[in-house]
């Protein structure tokens, strides 16, 4: 089983169930982001040597959400991406960026837009919008650690999760429990590895497009018809 933690998050599961029930009509556009808090220690530069890049490390979760909400059989028509190094120029040594935007077009006419960042000031900001023909459903568009608001002489404010693990703590617990149940009780695994492999392929193509500056196209069998090179 591949640990895409957001599939085990209570809010994302609720959003998925609402979409499946027809609450937003036909899902047509997905806009999602994975944005980490700035770490001035240089950790992300060292990590980039092994991570596969910001799309493979961060946006992979948004890509997996897309395949979940749009359906694992969705066929990619093209990917394109751009990125900048706003705070960590040394990331370019590893062909990586600290802010990046990616666009994925599917053969069925749907599109997905991804934003990834390593420089959030307040904390972890992972949000998603699924826009349909009759409405939209959003997840975490106003991040909050809990239900506490602080009122003082500066105004009203609330804290938000500081790390990815703070945000998805209970999703990791649910994931471990469901995997254990699959092993011990024979319950079905909650996700298909074929979709996980497809998510990695899309992430790698976005990373390549970002570095090369070229759009990458695919035929309906998944073969590349226009090749960008790092």
Outline where the language-model segments fall:
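Glycine- and charged-residue-rich phosphate/anionic-cofactor binding loop of Rossmann-like
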Residues: 2, 159-164, 182-199
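Short, hydrophobic secondary-structure boundary micro-motifs
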Residues: 27, 79, 160, 190-192, ...
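Predominantly a Rossmann-like dinucleotide-binding segment in NAD(P)-dependent oxidoreductases
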Residues: 1, 6-94, 213
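Hydrophobic side-chain positions on well-ordered alpha-helices
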Residues: 18, 181-182, 209
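A structural signal for well-ordered alpha-helical segments within the folded catalytic domains
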Residues: 9, 13, 53, 60-64, ...
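Contiguous beta-strand/loop segments that form the cofactor/metal-binding neighborhood of enzyme cores
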Residues: 64-147, 173-187, 204-205, 219-230
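Structured beta->alpha junctions
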Residues: 4-7, 118-120, 195, 222
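Short arginine-rich
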Residues: 202-212
């Amino acid at each position: 089983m591949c640990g895409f933690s957001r599939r085990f998050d209570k809010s994302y599961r609720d959003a998925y169930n609402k979409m499946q029930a027809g609450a937003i009509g036909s899902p047509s556009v997905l806009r999602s982001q994975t944005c980490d808090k700035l770490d001035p220690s240089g950790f992300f530069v060292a990590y980039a040597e092994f991570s596969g890049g910001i799309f493979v490390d961060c946006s992979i979760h948004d890509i997996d959400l897309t395949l979940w909400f749009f359906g694992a059989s969705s066929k990619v028509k093209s990917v394109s991406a751009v990125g900048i190094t706003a705070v960590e120029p040394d990331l370019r040594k590893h062909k990586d960026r600290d802010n990046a935007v990616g666009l994925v077009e599917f053969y069925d006419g749907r599109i997905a837009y991804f934003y990834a960042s390593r420089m959030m000031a307040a904390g972890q900001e992972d949000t998603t919008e699924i826009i349909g023909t009759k409405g939209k459903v959003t997840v975490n568009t106003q991040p909050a650690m809990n239900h506490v608001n602080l009122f003082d002489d500066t105004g009203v404010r609330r804290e938000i999760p500081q790390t990815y693990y703070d945000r998805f703590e209970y999703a990791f617990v649910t994931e471990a429990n469901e995997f254990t149940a699959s092993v011990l009780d024979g319950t079905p695994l909650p996700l298909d590895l074929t979709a996980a492999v497809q998510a990695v392929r899309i992430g790698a193509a976005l990373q390549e497009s970002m570095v090369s500056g070229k759009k990458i196209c695919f035929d309906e069998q998944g073969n590349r018809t226009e090749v960008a090179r790092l």
